[in-house]
Amino acid sequence: MSTFKITNNPNSIIIDDHLKLGGPDASNTIDVNGVYMTHHLSSISGKDVVQPFKHNNKYYILIGEIYNCDNTLGSDIYFCIEKYLEHGDKFTEYLDGEFLFIIYDEKTNTIDLFTDPWSTRQAFYYKIDNYFYFSTYPMTEPKDGRFGPGGLTQSFELKFAVYNDTEWNNTFYRIPHNSHHNYNVKTGILKPVNTELHKWNLNQYKDNLDDLTNSFEEAVLKRHTENSTLFLSSGLDSSPIAMCLADHKKHFNSMTCLTGPWEGREDMETLNQVLQYTGTYNKNIKIENLPPDYDIFWDEKKSKSKWSNNRNRLVFANLAHILTGFMREKCISEFNSKVIFTGNGGDEIFDNYPSLPAGYPLKFNGNTNKNPSGFSIWPEDLSTVFPWQHFYGGQARRLLDLFETLSLAYGLENRNAFYDKKFAQEWLHVMPWIKNQTPKVLQKKYLRDRGIKVPS
């Protein structure tokens, strides 16, 4: 996934060691007239370009993956530069991926930052004294942390608190979703250029799930890479990903957690059916017990983890448990994997977090209690609710940033099939009478079409 830092401060700072964890394979820093640009590489394909990459008077950094890249160009960043030179600031419409793209123009002394529709790759701006910083991680955190407490057993008020792209004070800012921001190094002014790079079509006219299903499979397959690891549960988001990969004869690893906060939460009948269905292509391991010397609650002074304190501080200081860190350790030790496949986004984009049991339609009792501030019925006029609470902000922002922070601590890359521009657009196009049949209508149909029990 890689990490970056751009600053006018020539000295090392506290987050440098954190950034190196996210890009363990190579590091490069260049000085461009007092602007220091650093890129830490996590190599996935082995076909990597030293970044920042200079073309004419501009320096480019790409964080993330471009899935529609022209492979003859040799690297994703070349493709991005080509599209930028062809289309200017509208070039992101020609990119399909999970990315952050940065351009420093030494002639105008400006920095431009472009995010994908959900800003799946973090970028923070902050200013301390006379120094400015752009980086993957913030220099400081809000008092109570960015991620809140561990969510599985928390109340609605805590678990589904609204986490927005937000400016916490006058010197600290997270570069938001779907946007182009420009920073003038001389004046110190950061300004939005475009806060809606990608415009969604809210016309609900498709009376079947065919195009949506095809776009789901495309989203999964273009994110598949050799030796990737799926975090697999019996849930409605990761299970269809596993079956799609198996249907297309794609080999993958998977990991299922049955201990800690997940103990007793899986529908084992559904999980076993999915494992049987995907068995030829799926190398699965189950985490049923933690090693006796593994501390599930992190204490820096008492920590028995083999990982450095820098990693512990980065990942676990604001979390109630560290089991998700253990799962990432296993990705490396069991599979030597560098890419994590997740079902993240299935709730945020396709369900708006209703609380109804899987067997009930959205109209059951006319409301929900899991997200009382949200809507329970998809309306005829989608513009009345779009973008809904968790489409960009809320849990979408919280979980994207949380999972990226967790994975970068181990030099791993997340790939999120549900945060796909075409796939999300196809969902928006589906007529409301289909959306309102049942929560996660696509995922349930995908399981039932393959003879898999829908989890209760």
What would you call each of these model-derived segments?
Residues M1-P292, D299, K338:
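Cysteine-centered catalytic environments shared across enzyme families
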Residues I6-I13, T108-D112, T120, I128-D129, ...:
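ATP-dependent adenylate-handling active sites, centered on carboxylate activation for C-N bond formation
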Residues S456:
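Conserved PLP cofactor-binding pocket of PLP-dependent enzymes
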